[in-house]
Amino acid sequence: MNPEPHVRHRRALPVLAPLALLALLTASAWAQAGTPKPGTVFKDCEKDCPEMVVLPTGSFMMGTPDDEVGRQADEGPLHKVTFTKPFAISRFPITFAEWDAFIQATGYMMPSGDERPGRLCQAGTATQGGRPTYGGNYPVTSRHPAVCMNLKEAQDYVAWLSNKTGKPYRLPSESVREYAARAGSTGPFPFPFDEGKEYSIAKHANTYGPADGYSYTAPVGSFPANAFGVYDMHGNIYEWTADCKHDNYVGAPSDGSPWQEKDCRFQSIRGNDYGEAPVFSRSGNRNDLYPNERGDWIGFRVVRDL
């Protein structure tokens, strides 16, 4: 049996927030358009490639203030991170349709992983295209987020996508992920709590409880996008990042690059999943996991340098 994932418990608070979205460009149309503007949505191939949205360059304060409800020591100190070069992030977590394209193209067969109730990931078969099977009524439509891959498999997908498109894809660093989640906001969330319900974000994210309408994962894009045009940043599934886990931000990169170590026992993950309380969904909330861990609550999204 795999060791228990390194999961902690947090709390949350409010803020304000908008929306956004723009045009969908194919790679050829984009080439004619020149440098894409922030908010531009594109795909590097018509089929099987994730939809990407261009984020603005700029700076933000990474981490959380001492008085933020639910704050943990690893969320500080607050520090400035600056992005000087444009990049894009996938609008949604990688979906089963996109993951299946990788599985089918490479012939990879995902092995069994976590078999504990609520985290079931059993090996797929050839007739299933290598996709794992799940317990209960777990949804596996093409628009649900792909789950159950470990860190190495997520990295393999990124390498495959880069080779397929000829474009530089990568996993997001923690700072990229937080920048995209905050979308210009500075509080715990880029949206307000549900009216009259403290610590409830059912109108904005899929977390613990039936109020949001989902007992397991929701199809990607089921909740509103943030001001950068990115979806599902505060619930549904946790997501792998490119960073090794660090106890705080002392010595953290200030340019948005991944913070890695030669010997990395725990890998940083971000977001929150369908089975955890909203307090874990705060933009600055951090978590970590063994790199070889699997679960029906862990997936990933990708970043593309422009």
Regions found by a protein language model. Name each.
Residues 1-10:
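N-terminal secretory signal peptides that target proteins for export/translocation
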Residues 16-27:
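Bacterial N-terminal signal peptides
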Residues 29-33:
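Boundary at the C-terminal end of the N-terminal hydrophobic targeting segment
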Residues 34-44:
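N-terminal low-complexity, Pro/Thr/Ser-rich intrinsically disordered segments
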Residues 43-122, 149-152, 235, 242:
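A short glycine-rich, aromatic-capped structural motif
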Residues 61, 65-71, 109, 114-115, ...:
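Functional-site microenvironments in short loops/helix caps that host divalent-cation chemistry
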Residues 120, 125-132:
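Surface-exposed intrinsically disordered loops and tails
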Residues 296-306:
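Short, structured beta-strand segments at or near domain termini in extracellular proteins/domains
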